[in-house]
Curated annotation (Swiss-Prot):
Keywords: Developmental protein, DNA-binding, Homeobox, Nucleus
Low complexity bias locations: 13-48, 89-102
Gene name per UniProt: En1
Protein's UniProt name: Homeobox protein engrailed-1
Compartments it resides in: Nucleus
Lineage, highest ranks first: Eukaryota, Metazoa, Chordata, Craniata, Vertebrata
Region described as Disordered: 1-102, 138-167, 229-253, 293-315
Length: 401
């Protein structure tokens, strides 16, 4: 019996190594002794997220320690006690946004996005949130068998109760966004991830210690991402100077950047804060004129001011008897006065050249109107409809008034 006892150990170690080599990288952490028992007992739990688990971080490899366990008995050990709830908070935000994203799945050119007021605005929050979610997903994949059971239970519970999932996501995002020096723990007062790792290492469980180390690495990545996104997220919630974004998310879940991301990026209801700017309409709204849209201004034509005809009209010239006598004499001599003669006459009579020119025009018009003889060319044009003025011709040039 003493010679045959190492043989099952070697066979079991070789079998575990073969299974570890055949298993994908995302599922290699569930081969610990504690995970085998727990996964066998909870075989009906299925992850909710359709995405494959991301690869574990290189800082916490768990495959080499599996081959050296001479003190373990051949029979399967009892399952370890479940760990405290902080790993659930770390792993929950990585998979919580998926059901909501599937419910509100929209494309870039969907009509709801075009008709929304914030169409065309740049969204700077999704990138840090996705980085935090990926880091949390890596930490969740690196968790041990007990944390996997808790994560599956949290996912199934969140799938059945959407209101509870919203609160869990808010608290988990708040714990992820907590800065290293902010000293803000989980909302329920449980110990942080560093304390969990210390307790696991003292207990002597290698799988739990590796999972806690991976969770600490994921928390460091999340803290770096939160520090990078702190300037953009500081003005999003009410009271940006009150503390860190994580503390604000824990105290006010409705102002959490993760919830704002779910509302604005996936087509859900947009959460409005108290210090929000006035609503800005997109440019296409002003291209069409309807009663239910704001107008860019009146489309009426400006009314022209009525001109005062008495002020703009040239005053009537009152000629003296001497001026009229000289003008009539010049008109009898020549009905069309020359420019040189008009200049000399204006100097002699103390009149303007325009006044003399207008008097000659009026004199010719009066004579033409007084006589009833029509112009032959004018009559011909009037017959064709090309001329509509009544014209007269003066035969006697010597005729006076």
């Amino acid at each position: 019996m003493e010679e045959q006892q190492p043989e099952p150990k070697s066979q079991r170690d070789s079998g575990l190594g073969a299974v570890a080599a055949a298993a994908p990288s995302g599922l290699s952490l569930s081969l610990s002794p504690g995970a085998s028992g727990s996964s066998g007992s909870d075989g009906d739990s299925v992850p909710v997220s359709p995405q494959p688990a991301p690869p574990s971080p290189p800082a916490a490899p768990c495959l080499p320690p599996l081959a050296h366990h001479p003190h373990l008995p051949p029979h399967p050990p009892p399952p370890p006690p479940p760990p405290p709830p902080p790993p659930q908070h770390l792993a929950a935000p990585a998979h919580q946004p998926q059901p909501a994203a599937q419910l509100h799945r929209t494309t870039n050119f969907f009509i709801d996005n075009i008709l929304r007021p914030d169409f065309g605005c740049k969204k700077e929050q999704p990138l840090p949130q996705l980085l935090v979610a990926s880091a949390a997903a890596g930490g969740g994949a690196a968790a041990g068998g007990g944390s996997r059971v808790e994560r599956d239970r949290g996912q199934t519970g969140a799938g059945r109760d959407p209101v509870h999932s919203l609160g869990t996501r808010a608290s988990g995002a708040a714990s992820l966004l907590c800065a290293p020096d902010a000293n803000c723990g989980p909302p329920d007062g449980s110990q942080p991830a560093t304390a969990v790792s210390a307790g696991a290492s003292k207990a002597g469980n290698p799988a739990a210690a590796a999972a806690a180390a991976a969770a600490a690495a994921a928390a460091a990545v999340a803290a770096a991402a939160a520090a990078a996104s702190k300037p953009s997220d500081s003005g999003g919630g009410s009271g940006g100077n009150a503390g860190s974004p994580g503390a604000q998310g824990a105290k006010f879940p409705e102002h959490n950047p993760a919830i704002l991301l779910m509302g604005s990026a996936n087509g859900g209801p947009v959460v409005k804060t108290d210090s929000q700017q006035p609503l800005v309409w997109p440019a296409w709204v002003y291209c069409t004129r309807y009663s239910d849209r704001p107008s860019s201004g009146p489309r009426t034509r400006k009314l022209k001011k009525k001109k005062n005809e008495k002020e703009d009209k040239r005053p009537r010239t009152a000629f003296t008897a001497e001026q009229l006598q000289r003008l009539k004499a010049e008109f009898q001599a020549n009905r069309y006065i020359t420019e040189q003669r008009r200049q000399t006459l204006a100097q002699e009579l103390s009149l303007n050249e325009s006044q003399i020119k207008i008097w000659f025009q009026n004199k010719r018009a009066k004579i033409k109107k007084a006589t009833g003889i029509k112009n032959g060319l004018a009559l011909h044009l009037m017959a064709q409809g090309l001329y509509n003025h009544s014209t007269t011709t003066v035969q006697d040039k010597d005729e006076s008034e």
